[in-house]
């Protein structure tokens, strides 16, 4: 169809609005934050995909002060921020170098940083100016670290 902007889609949080997804999918992504069921927030995050295949799970401790990679701990700048490692995992499975990536809910910019690391062409949108500025500062800091070496 000529009105499509992408060949495939990955939509985080789609379990909250599944009736609005265009069709059923067998290939969901599950982000297991490796936290206790006693926490007040979700233990897992789910993404609907348009991809062919089976459900896949990414395990990575992501709980406020506790993170999988404490040596390279990420500063939290967004309420629904996901770890860069999650996007590294997604891109390693579903993208190839030079592929175009569109993120319509840029948030903290983790997807943007991962796209840069994985040599992907990236376009991102964020409606909230403060969130956009915060992720842009985070991204510029990441890129400046690359030029040091």
Task: Name what the model sees in each region.
Residues 3-149:
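Class I S-adenosyl-L-methionine
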